[in-house]
Every structure is written in structure tokens, then in C-alpha cells.
Amino acid sequence: MSWNISHPQLSDKLFGKNGVLEEQKSPGFKKRETEVYVGNLPLDISKEEILYLLKDFNPLDVHKIQNGCKCFAFVDLGSMQKVTLAIQELNGKLFHKRKLFVNTSKRPPKRTPDMIQQPRAPLVLEKASGEGFGKTAAIIQLAPKAPVDLCETEKLRAAFFAVPLEMRGSFLVLLLRECFRDLSWLALIHSVRGEAGLLVTSIVPKTPFFWAMHVTEALHQNMQALFSTLAQAEEQQPYLEGSTVMRGTRCLAEYHLGDYGHAWNRCWVLDRVDTWAVVMFIDFGQLATIPVQSLRSLDSDDFWTIPPLTQPFMLEKDILSSYEVVHRILKGKITGALNSAVTAPASNLAVVPPLLPLGCLQQAAA
């Protein structure tokens, strides 16, 4: 079954001009203190995916190296501070079921034994009670019983997909309750079914998960009202004092829409590291790391009456492997909420209370 992606005119109408994603190219490779080493990468990873992995740190350049069954990269982040922050946030993080090894580029890091993983037996699935997109989901294939070499392991990797942190109930319950005082609109989301057009705002690469806006007349009206209000308020809203920025702060920050330009958008502070804040852009379903001094105040409830424009979805059968789908319309059928979960203590996954349905989209045939 193939994608049914509409022409970009509708997304242009909502966002502006048509944007084209371009891969940054390296004029030459030279190790610098502003570069970060990213090791234990999948063999088939592209430069574009590496840049996306470090998108929160505004990477300038990437140099990918593949040696036999090993793949690693050096990424220029532009400053030593960003290198330190990237190491803190990404080292040890699971990426395509591989533990990333992130370090400075001063010397090649030693390969640790826990980085060499043999195929594991499938995790145990259990039925989750209720509905909610705070569930941890898994799609699993049987792993081979006999040991294989690392090259063969790359080809036989199990298709395991866990609901990302920002889509889980433990995160969203806190976010929505602190941002929106009136949650009566939640009932409408539970009732959404049938044929739909979804304007994709962000994806989780090589998984079935993505954030999208359900294209309706109501969405168009909400977008116009919200963006008009934020545009008028932006210059009047003061920048936040550094001491007031903490987890749970409602604020306004500049969101990058690629070639579409920039837009000030509602966001919620998830964490703070020195002079950097990790924020969730409410209306685009996107996490980003931005300077604390660039945040503006947006604590009045008047700015939080319009529900979030976007929500998470999961494809029933396919995965998203191309970034070209971002800012495009996907057409398909919303079949319901995700209703299965996985118990996997070793992988630090947890079943959490339901809140909203993680919409399951059945792709339309081409």
C-alpha cells in the first residue's frame, strides 16, 4: 500500500509558501572542539537523519563515516556549550534500538561491551485498559535464535516501536492540565473517526508515529484566530527573567518552519539546563532546545482558550521514512485509538494512565 499525499497547495494555504528540505553539505572535514562524536549509528542512516537527530542543537555540518559494520559521525554544533548539552541529552539514548554513544571529538571513544547487542527475544505484549495515546506500543517480529554477526543483525533488526516520551500520558496529562484550564474539548477528540486529511507537522523517523493537524473548517478558523492573536501580542509580551523560567512555565517562543519562515508559538517548558530550556511547542508537537533569554511571557489564560492544533497519530501498517511528508496532507481513515501496550522494565518503558486517543490512521490506497 502506498502513500496518498495531496498536492502542497492546501498546506501552502495554511503555512505559506512551499518549502523544500535541503541536506547540508560539508565543504571539508576537520575535527574541532565544536564537533560532537555520535557513535553506534545504524549502517543505513542518512546524513539527513543524523542532522534531524541533533536538530535541537542547530547542527551546522555532519561527516558520516562507515567502516565495515561500524557507523559513526562527527557533527559540528557551532559551540562547545552545545556539544556539552548534546552529550548530556543524547549519550546512552536508544535510537533505532541501539544505544547511542555521544562524546567530544577530541579522540575516538572506546567501544564498550554494552554497545554490542545480540538479538533479544520479543517483549511480552499485554492488553491495556481503557483508551489513550499515553500507551507504550510495540510491533514485534521474532528475533533469530542463533547468534549472527553485526552486519547480519543490521538486516534482521526487530521492528520495535515504543510511543515517544512526548506522546505518553505521563507527559501529556501534566502538560495539558497546566496549559489549559478548560479541557471540555477532549470529548471531541475521542469521537473522531472515519476519512480524514492530516496536515503533518513532525514525524518520528522510521516509526509509525507522527504529529498532525486534522484538517477541518474549525482547524482553519482556530489557526487564523490563534496566529493572529499571537502575532499582535508578540511585541507586547516581555521577555522572561531567567530566574522565572522553570518546568511548567507557559511561554512564547519562535518556531522554525523551515523554508516557510518563523512563527511565534505557544510552548511549555519541560526542563532547563543552565541557559537553555527544553520546550514543547503545543501546536506543532515538537520538542526543541532554545536559549532561555529568547522566551517571552504568555501566562494569561486568554492565550490558552484555543485547544492544541495538533495531536499524535500512528500508522496502522507502515512507517514514516521520508521527511518530505512534513507540511503535506496525508489522506486516510482514522480507525480509533491505540489500545495495546508493552511491559518492558529493562527498557525503562511504562504503561501510563490514558488521556487522549493516539489516533490510528489507515492509509488510503493510491
Swiss-Prot record:
PROSITE patterns: RRM. Residues 210-317 form the Tudor domain. It comes from the Eukaryota. InterPro entries: Nucleotide-bd_a/b_plait_sf, RBD_domain_sf, RRM_dom, RRM_TDRD10, SNase_OB-fold_sf, Tudor. GO terms for cellular component: membrane; mitochondrion. The keyword Protease does not apply. Pfam families: RRM_1, TUDOR. Keywords: Coiled coil, RNA-binding. Residues 216-237 form a coiled coil. One of its GO terms (molecular function) is protein kinase A regulatory subunit binding. Gene3D superfamilies: 2.30.30.140, 2.40.50.90, 3.30.70.330. SMART domains: RRM (SM00360). Residues 34-107 form the RRM domain. The keyword Nucleus does not apply. This is Tudor domain-containing protein 10. It comes from Homo sapiens (Human). The lineage of its organism: Eukaryota, Metazoa, Chordata, Craniata, Vertebrata. The gene is TDRD10.
